[in-house]
């Protein structure tokens, strides 16, 4: 892990294939710990991780907090409803309060785009050593979700050695509300960065044409790794055209809370055109895995029968992979490598 060079983790745009390989390797090692009987490592003992979630979360927050505890870190949780935000305190001042209490890592989620980036820049300008890990910001990015989806797919294609090479040349279909999805954006960086070809599928109202050029012409403020041989991104409007030849399918939640106007005729119409079912997946030509970042709207993004089928649906596997991936991120960001590596037990991946 000596080549790790990211101080903050704010998005995946600048991640190289070597970065993805480092995270997959470390996450796989952490994932194997229960098999050895080891439930906890002292790698981050004495470190303080603060989870500042200004937006509701079940999986991400719980997963980060469990990951920190598995590495023996102390954890502080922030709740907007019981904070000084209601008294007019700014997000930056709230974050600085936790920094003053000794937080080594701030895991930040906010409904507004670029809040974690601004916090990181402000803390750097102040000369603080605290690092910022983006737990999801607006429509921009959700790095840890993109990475756990990457691990889930890499393990599906090669359980013994989940590496970026396991994704090389694979066709991954992402279907649904891509316009409002930070998960889709992070998956685009992760999957194409590992050589997978991504097909985006959805109605025009939820999938603008410019997404086809997303990784070739990144939005302002994002620096894309220029070296990696990225997979390509294409847009399909009809699911029947997108599915043939797919190696995996990811469907996304309709984020009605982010829709400022009527973008869909009806949920029934959406399910008819873009909902996944066992029958519709037969268009892939073979059995393929289905992913969903959760929470799932049953009967909208996919049928209940498909969601409850563990032979195809990997939703619970995604949840299981969230903890080791976030352990890997916290380890890389907060631990002095020389000290932390000495605490790792030898685990064969």
From Swiss-Prot:
Name of the top EC class for this enzyme: transferase
Presence of keyword Hydrolase: no
Family annotation (Pfam families): OTCace (PF00185), OTCace_N (PF02729)
Record Gene3D superfamilies: Aspartate/ornithine carbamoyltransferase
Pathway annotation: Pyrimidine metabolism; UMP biosynthesis via de novo pathway; (S)-dihydroorotate from bicarbonate: step 2/3
Alphabetical list of InterPro entries matching this protein: Asp/Orn_carbamoyltranf_P-bd, Asp/Orn_carbamoylTrfase, Asp/Orn_carbamoylTrfase_sf, Asp_carbamoyltransf, Asp_carbamoyltransf_Asp/Orn-bd
GO molecular function terms noted in the UniProt entry: amino acid binding; aspartate carbamoyltransferase activity
Chain residues that bind carbamoyl phosphate: 59-60, 109, 142, 145, 294-295
The reaction(s) this protein catalyses: carbamoyl phosphate + L-aspartate = N-carbamoyl-L-aspartate + phosphate + H(+)
Transferase found in the keyword field: yes
GO cellular component, one term: cytosol
Keywords of the record: Pyrimidine biosynthesis, Transferase
Alphabetized HAMAP family for the sequence: Asp_carb_tr
Function text: Catalyzes the condensation of carbamoyl phosphate and aspartate to form carbamoyl aspartate and inorganic phosphate, the committed step in the de novo pyrimidine nucleotide biosynthesis pathway.
Assembly and oligomerization: Heterododecamer (2C3:3R2) of six catalytic PyrB chains organized as two trimers (C3), and six regulatory PyrI chains organized as three dimers (R2).
Protein name: Aspartate carbamoyltransferase catalytic subunit
